[in-house]
């Protein structure tokens, strides 16, 4: 058997033992369906939702390509394909969807320093912290080059002044990542920073 064939057997076995029946195709129609955004404010009507998130997060499979040192699964593309195929085969629902997974984690992996990666990636992967994005502003909408929220570097922190709007799920988020203007004298498409 090849390594990938062995991995497929391992995934099937793990899913069989760890994916609750209410998180699979064929679950009773009256099974409560929870949001899968995670975070400290999450409320789970179905305890299996939290159990499934915890198990997948512990395995690192909510972000399977992230290196294990940051809490991810450390899988390669072929292994992720197998994981997705086997989850699809049993109709397993995604244990976690979030701005942290879609938008923040890739930025941290590419541009974050080591401390930021170690602090935030494991919490994103396990669904412990929920993030929202702070991009849109009154009068600018999706024209991010025209944003006016300013951030002044105070040495050990930034002082942020401005307003963000249309921030989906801000009321349920634990943290925000935002685009802010740190170079006010630069052309409007420059001088923008990404703050946590």
Residue ranges and their predicted role:
Residues 96-115, 141:
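N-terminal glycine-rich flavin-associated loop
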Residues 84, 105-108, 121, 196:
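Conserved protein kinase catalytic domain
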Residues 1-98, 115-126:
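Amphipathic, small/basic residue-rich leader segments at the start of a protein or domain
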Residues 140-143, 158:
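Hydrophobic, small-residue-rich alpha-helical packing segments that form membrane-like cores
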Residues 148, 157, 161-196:
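A short core secondary-structure module
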Residues 69, 136-140, 165-166:
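Short, solvent-exposed loop/turn elements at beta->coil junctions and helix N-caps
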Residues 127-135, 179:
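A short, Trp-centered hydrophobic/proline-enriched beta-strand micro-motif
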